[in-house]
Design a protein with these regions (language model features):
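Cytosolic, long alpha-helical scaffolding segments
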Residues: 2, 6-222
Length: 222
């Protein structure tokens, strides 16, 4: 057998190698799609809470985007189950996927309360929380895109920003709860508003969880 024939790689092995890289790519591609959907959903949420003209349609559209994000989660789970080599640690992919999905779930849960509780009046504190969530979602998206480009150290700047935004949300929660108990006399209205404020703050905690997961990825791979 000639030397060039013995060293040639069979086409089947080449195809397997190509498939492997495609499977590696799907994790980053799907994470980018999750981040894109999250930004779209949070911006829609912010627009919705500043209007509230049709809370039923608002809640329905948010549920659709939450379901879209769930599909991305299922895609990643399916690929993890059949892929041996992944671009980063499997547990990091799973943790990042879960934390992104938690943010989306939190925003959708808040949106659903507007329909459930028949809230049709704008609230300045909810608007401020929504602004924090929009800025957080953009920080998450920027960090995810850096991750998929393997630019790990620049991700840290966005992680720090996410931590700062979560601190702002903590401060805002204290202010709005204080204002709520000082000014709202209707106990039912107080309960409704308080739950939404707290859910919004918890959603910023989920954004911080994304940052913590990204920090872990930086440490593992730097």
């Amino acid at each position: 057998m000639r030397r060039d024939e013995s060293s040639a790689i069979p086409n089947s092995q080449v195809d397997k190698g190509i498939d492997m890289f495609k499977k590696k790519d799907i994790f980053f591609k799907t994470l980018e799609e999750m981040a894109d959907t999250l930004v779209k959903a949070v911006e829609y949420f912010a627009d919705g809470v500043s209007n509230l003209s049709d809370v039923k349609a608002f809640a329905k559209r948010m549920k659709e985007m939450e379901s879209e994000c769930d599909q991305y989660t299922h895609t990643i789970l399916k690929e993890l189950n059949k892929t041996f080599i992944t671009p980063i640690e499997r547990e990091d992919i799973m943790a990042l996927t879960t934390s992104l999905d938690d943010v989306m779930d939190g925003v959708e849960a808040c949106a659903s309360r507007f329909e459930m509780y028949h809230i049709k009046e704008k609230d300045e504190y909810i608007t401020l929380f929504a602004d924090i969530l929009v800025r957080s979602a953009h920080q998450i998206k920027s960090a995810i895109y850096l991750l998929t480009q393997k630019k790990l150290l620049p991700m840290r700047e966005h992680c720090i920003s996410l931590n700062e935004l979560e601190n702002q949300a903590d401060d805002l929660l204290r202010v709005c709860i204080s204002s709520l108990f000082a000014n709202v006399k209707d106990p039912i209205e107080l309960i409704k508003r308080k739950e939404i404020y707290e859910r919004l703050e918890q959603t910023t905690d989920c954004c911080e969880d994304v940052a913590n997961t990204l920090e872990s990825i930086i440490m593992r791979n730097s």
